[in-house]
Amino acid sequence: MSEIVVSKFGGTSVADFDAMNRSADIVLSDANVRLVVLSASAGITNLLVALAEGLEPGERFEKLDAIRNIQFAILERLRYPNVIREEIERLLENITVLAEAAALATSPALTDELVSHGELMSTLLFVEILRERDVQAQWFDVRKVMRTNDRFGRAEPDIAALAELAALQLLPRLNEGLVITQGFIGSENKGRTTTLGRGGSDYTAALLAEALHASRVDIWTDVPGIYTTDPRVVSAAKRIDEIAFAEAAEMATFGAKVLHPATLLPAVRSDIPVFVGSSKDPRAGGTLVCNKTENPPLFRALALRRNQTLLTLHSLNMLHSRGFLAEVFGILARHNISVDLITTSEVSVALTLDTTGSTSTGDTLLTQSLLMELSALCRVEVEEGLALVALIGNDLSKACGVGKEVFGVLEPFNIRMICYGASSHNLCFLVPGEDAEQVVQKLHSNLFE
């Protein structure tokens, strides 16, 4: 069999009939594209998440109508809509029943079952668009191969099981024609639907590419590649034509939203290049993320992540003692929380948490039970409304004058916390949320323009 390219299209790329057709054009322009991974149509997942929270009848019917209208606007423009009308109606009926159940009692498992319907509908519609072009396209339920644990809302894939199941059930289908499947969703051992967390469709594409030994992953979104920073914050931001895995991973981890942070893990493990382009203008080019690049610059990009919380833990018991940090991290681990940045002194430790939420519902990670456990160990201070700015580069810790070049620009601003030296690829600092955009703009102007 020839090489395999996995193409993933985000919500805006399958938002309506015209967007789906543009995405179909991209798929058909490359004969090596054998597997297509889709998100739900834009807006659908947010509507489903709202339903999963349990709504009063009036609000519930309003959301259900909005979902129907988005999907039927695509369905009715098909030449032969009746071919899949019954299947779409069945999924909409499922959504209605599950939304009624959520109004009585919510649960993470119910939420995952409900929100999975967005991807199920978008993939059915996309397959029919391809078939009306006389393309041999198959719909495939990714839950047959994407085995995960039962941590609903933020499930973790079983890599070994995925590889085995993909070889048995997915690979043979790629020999028969184009396969269309869902991002974001999976299933646990008992067959219950799980999700990989918001933005997990990119991760799905990379995981499937790894399992199928693909030659490349294409991520099609609404921007033509990865930029030196968010163009909505800095209009002078420049596209990066080629970037190394390590640099892109730092950018994704610290807030650049073009790629889901976990996307690059399978790509790095299996050395699979990732291309990022715009489905609205595929000829505009994009960014290739690969193992290494020639002559990487000292400063590569700036990433911004809002809604950060700083926890400062004070305890005199830290003084000349052992095991305090182990206890703190044990508590955080029990609450499934990972720490971003950390600084310590003799009697205190400060650490940052990304509290925007990374479950399918977007719930905050900073719960009362977590704070109570920490308070039993030490005095806890919580500061919210902060933003994390990360300067991404190469060998930053070995270069002379980086501190002067960066912090000279930041003199007018209050810097709440700095992390530097643990990685040669980043210099991170925490600033008040209201200053974040100005900080990024000034740094970009001085370092990149």
Swiss-Prot record:
SUPFAM superfamilies in alphabetical order: ACT-like, Carbamate kinase-like
Activity control note: Synthesis and activity are sensitive to the allosteric inhibitor lysine, one of the end metabolites of the aspartic acid family branched pathway.
UniProt-listed InterPro entries: AceGlu_kinase-like_sf, ACT-like_dom_sf, ACT_Aspartokinase, ACT_dom, AKiii-LysC-EC, Asp/Glu/Uridylate_kinase, Asp_kin_monofn, Asp_kinase
Keywords, in A-Z order: Allosteric enzyme, Amino-acid biosynthesis, ATP-binding, Kinase, Lysine biosynthesis, Nucleotide-binding, Transferase
Ranges of residues in domain ACT: 313-394
Effect of E119D: Increases KM for aspartate about 3000-fold
EC identifiers of the protein: 2.7.2.4
UniProt key word Transmembrane: no
Source organism superkingdom: Bacteria
Other notes: Aspartokinases I and II also catalyze the same reaction(s).
Name used for this protein in its record: Lysine-sensitive aspartokinase 3
